[in-house]
Amino acid sequence: MPKILSYNVFFKSMLTDPVYNYCKPIIKNNGLEYTTCLYNVSKFIASQKDLDFVLLQEATNWKTLQKITLNLSQMETISTCFDVEIIVTFYNKQKYQLDPIDNMFIGYMDSVNRPFHVLFFQNNICLINLHAGHKGDIYFLDKYLVRSLKKLDNYQKFIDKLTTYDIIIGGDFNDELKIDFYILSDNFFGISEGRRLYGNTFEPSCCNPVLNYLGRTKKSYDHILSTLNDNVSTVIPVVKASDHMPIISTITKNIGFDFDGVLHLDVNKPDYEGQRNPYNLIGPYNIFNNIINLILKEILDNNNVYIITARKDTKVNRSVINSHLKKTILKNYINKIPILFSGGKDKTLLLTKYNINTFYDDSCLRINELFLSKILGNLSNLNQLYFVDPDNQSYQLVTKQNINKLCGNFINKNIISLLDQSDNTHNNSNIKLISTFIDFNHNYQFRNPDINYLMKELNDIINENNLDYHQIDYIDKLQDSIVKMIIKELKQNINNLK
């Protein structure tokens, strides 16, 4: 549960020779020279305990600020400047370490004086500090990310992280974000609908030209957003410091773990569906220490941990799970770990209900169900899905590139099952389902030549300018016909792929 501070500290307040009437010069005995405004910024930051990340914009004289602010002096720093404006990110080096490689790239928004940097931490956190331009510049963030990444030979490494890490974006957005905010929607990133970010601030944080009259602060321009939806931000009034107010956010992660084969090691080999069952239903079991240690770390970080098992909800099963936990280092935290039961069914509904962001399971049956649910848009909050291997006491992030290697061809069976039900499914769902099927069967070619012909006709019409309502109606009918033809063909030829 990281605690993040974002603050546009106003370059005019930070200058050594104040050009702003509301900031007075200070000379300290240690030889450092700074303004009363910078001192007030320092005093506020120093008053905030347990900060994990501090994101500053317009951070002129940030090195002086760090020297006179105790908690900042104990943190690691990353700074970016292309011309005049500087952004700086401070992070708690005791809790967070940058990835060993491919851990950072930089860029700018609509001008070189609107910089951003993107940092990747070993905790699977992607942190973006930015200062956007005015007039909706923030909505072009994808374009600026693509521009920066295309300059890098190893850009695919960064795309892989952007699409799987928990993302936190903080800074001066210069926009009130009155609509849902998505990033990575550009085709360059390879995820059809992008990733939604939560936590829009509705409290005014900008812009107070006299630095000491809070009633002049009317715009909610500063935000801390995250792909984790349990995100609460607060704007804190600070006078005679900056024309912006600081914003602090605490973000909580919801993490789920299967029980059999995840919290213990004693499971049979996978059955024909990829399901792994325990040797016996009552234990005792050998402890999966790597997972138990991970759970303890998440609890100590104040994240929410759930056990989500395929077992049925019975007194015996609850007793078995609690007895196992009592044998581990989690024995004093059992009351912090809710136990949920799917009763042998798909876990999608439970993961949705409890807003699970990360989930660990050893069953290919469940992994494929959840992975497909994620692709079809039914698990918008699930950022990471891990396949657990109890035989080797390891776990691995599931991606589009490795799922067939990890879990065979089970996912096709799930897609085929949904195709069989497609006659009563909404057209948009069918389109997504077809796209998913083709994505996992790259060599599949349509046998019906009419499909390719109609798809070309549809594309030609869509590319026309100034469509009238007759053409729009025709597009809907044409799309419906194409979907029905594709579904029919896939059903006829699906046996070749089983």
Curated annotation (Swiss-Prot):
Cited InterPro entries: Endo/exonu/phosph_ase_sf, HAD_sf
Source taxon at top rank: Viruses
Name this polypeptide is given: Uncharacterized protein L684
UniProt organism field: Acanthamoeba polyphaga mimivirus
